[in-house]
């Protein structure tokens, strides 16, 4: 797994000529308690999921020079179009909970935690508030 990503996903069965059915991200926060162990044991480049990561996970990501990318929740069909190949590599009997190997191209993701441990969930709200505070409020009811 060295140099690869883990994508927290439960893909739906493909229909017709699809490689995989809708493949939206699952919440990564529930994996926080395993993040350090997984990164140190595997040499992963990073993880892909949705939602923010807790302080311990962010620290583990930083310490291992890894990254955490967010895929768009609610856009499972869009994400699935980036999957070029899909192969079940373990636990096929678990269906969508099996372990898959995906080959992806142009997957729509955003960097949520970079190799320096900078989390968009910590930095973005301050930036947004500063920008929103500069937007003039117009009372449409006042005419």
What does each model-found stretch correspond to?
Residues 1-107:
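Feature captures the catalytic cores and cofactor-binding loops of soluble hydro-lyases/lyases
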Residues 81-143:
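C-terminal binding/interaction regions
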């Amino acid at each position: 797994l060295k140099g690869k990503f883990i994508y927290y996903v439960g893909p739906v069965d493909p229909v017709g000529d699809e490689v995989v059915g809708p493949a939206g991200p699952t919440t990564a926060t529930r994996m926080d308690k395993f993040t350090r162990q997984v990164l140190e044991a595997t040499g992963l480049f990073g993880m892909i999921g949705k939602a923010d990561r807790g302080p311990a996970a962010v620290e583990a990501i930083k310490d291992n020079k890894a990254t955490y990318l967010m895929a768009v929740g609610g856009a499972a069909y869009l994400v699935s179009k980036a999957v070029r190949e899909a192969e079940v590599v373990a636990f096929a009997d678990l269906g969508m909970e099996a372990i898959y190997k995906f080959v992806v191209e142009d997957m729509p993701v955003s960097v949520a935690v970079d190799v320096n441990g900078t989390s968009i969930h910590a930095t973005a709200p301050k930036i947004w508030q500063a920008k929103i505070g500069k937007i003039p409020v117009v009372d449409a009811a006042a005419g």
